Each structure stands twice: as structure tokens, then as C-alpha cells.
């Protein structure tokens, strides 16, 4: 008998849960609701909310909008978004994650200090990611984004550095960057770093590694756009080479189910629990066949 188990620690983080709840609440009123960008980096959940009436728009479409209601997702937005909304009489339903909001405020405070010209505000994150765009926006576009310790080489080590992190990045990689900067910063410059990684995300990594290591086969469920999904899937691979990234049940290769005694189903902070349950049930059907 093959055991199939869902990782109880996987699924939406509280920021995403709040954003989806706010969307459902507004849609239940029967009014038109727009969302600036995909509410979550999971196509199946986006499709579910679209069926309920949620209209996803891009930034160009947002700029053309007038007298409407727009949901801002958990990732957060730059100040410009709120300015456009005010100008165009757009009602904002703000679902920015409180962890992201606190980070935005800290970066803005650092940017407004008198000695800004003498230092660099550096953000460890994915270039172009929605959260990172919102963070860089707090500095009027002047923050430097780096994706790795390798990219830290482009920094000016004769100038002081203030380092922040996208909330969903790897704690280990953040520490690597910290050590690299400490090693190369000029004695005349100062270096301060702020561990701004969400603990709900960071704490998942050891638990996920443990879960992946206890099963013969892992199906990691995540949208292909999810930055957090890619990072967590890599953690699964480190402890279990028989880990496979899938977006939905149709991507399961039935031949993988041969000669295994236990299968684990887990996912990213952008993966809905209902989708993992659907995949669990689909695996059970394949096993019976």
C-alpha cells in the first residue's frame, strides 16, 4: 500500500490568505473588482477567482482606469501606484502584507536620512518581482537590487551600505551576501544589514526539508512564476533527488509512481491547499489503476 501525504505546513502564507479573503469579500457584494497583477503566483487560484468575477489588469491598464475599485495584492506597491489611484478616483482595497508594509517603511526612512548621498541602499531580491518593485519605489528608484553574493561584486565598497531583503528570499543566501560585504567593505565605510525575511517563510525550509526526506517521491506544487516556489523546490531537491515540480494534476507522470512506498505532496506560500488536496486525490486514483 502506497502512502500519500500532504505537508501540513505547506500552502498560503497569512499575507496571501488575507488578500484572497478581501477579494472574495468584495466579489460577494456583486461589484466589479480589478486586481493589479495576479493576486497570487498560481494560475489555478487565479482562474478560480476569475470565475468569481475578479479582473486582473496590468500597470498600463491600471493607468487608464477611472472611477473603479482595485485590489492591491500582498506583494505591495510603489508610491506611484497610490498617486495614480488618487488622481483617477480609484478606490484601493489594500491587501499589502503587513510584513512587506513594515519593510517598505524602514527602507523609506533610511532613504530620507540626510546622509543618503553617502551610502547605498541595497535590496537582496529578484529583479522585476512585484515586491521588489514596491521596495525600490520607496527610494525613488535609487536602491540597488542584487540577486546573489556574486552580484554583490558590483557594489561600491568605498561607500557605506544598508542591506535589506525581499521577504520571501533564502536566509542562507542572505547570510552569504552579508559575509561577502563584510569581507570587502572599506574600513572608512559602514555596513548595516537588516534581516527582513518573513519568518513564516524562513521557518518552512527546515520543516520542508524534513518532510521531503521522509518520502520516496515528492510532488512540489507551485506556479511557474512563484519566486518562493522555486526556492522551496530547490530545498526539496537538496534532500530528495526524486522531487518533481508540478503546476497541476495533469503534469503527474504515472510512471514515477512505480516502486515507491511513500509519496509526499507539498507546495509554496502561493499554493492553495485545495489544489494540493486535488493532486493527492488524483495520485490515489492513479495508484488504484
UniProtKB/Swiss-Prot annotation:
Its cofactor is [4Fe-4S] cluster. It is an enzyme of class 1 (oxidoreductase). GO terms for molecular function: 4 iron, 4 sulfur cluster binding; 4-hydroxy-3-methylbut-2-enyl diphosphate reductase activity; metal ion binding. InterPro entries: LytB/IspH. Dimethylallyl diphosphate binds at residues 41, 75, 129, 226-228, 270. (2E)-4-hydroxy-3-methylbut-2-enyl diphosphate binds at residues 41, 75, 129, 167, 226-228, 270. The keyword Cell inner membrane does not apply. Its EC number is 1.17.7.4. [4Fe-4S] cluster binds at residues 13, 97, 198. Pathway: Isoprenoid biosynthesis; dimethylallyl diphosphate biosynthesis; dimethylallyl diphosphate from (2E)-4-hydroxy-3-methylbutenyl diphosphate: step 1/1; Isoprenoid biosynthesis; isopentenyl diphosphate biosynthesis via DXP pathway; isopentenyl diphosphate from 1-deoxy-D-xylulose 5-phosphate: step 6/6. Isopentenyl diphosphate binds at residues 41, 75, 129, 226-228, 270. It comes from the Bacteria. GO terms for cellular component: cytosol. It catalyses: isopentenyl diphosphate + 2 oxidized [2Fe-2S]-[ferredoxin] + H2O = (2E)-4-hydroxy-3-methylbut-2-enyl diphosphate + 2 reduced [2Fe-2S]-[ferredoxin] + 2 H(+); dimethylallyl diphosphate + 2 oxidized [2Fe-2S]-[ferredoxin] + H2O = (2E)-4-hydroxy-3-methylbut-2-enyl diphosphate + 2 reduced [2Fe-2S]-[ferredoxin] + 2 H(+). The keyword Phosphoprotein does not apply. HAMAP family: IspH. Catalyzes the conversion of 1-hydroxy-2-methyl-2-(E)-butenyl 4-diphosphate (HMBPP) into a mixture of isopentenyl diphosphate (IPP) and dimethylallyl diphosphate (DMAPP). Acts in the terminal step of the DOXP/MEP pathway for isoprenoid precursor biosynthesis. Belongs to the IspH family. This is 4-hydroxy-3-methylbut-2-enyl diphosphate reductase.
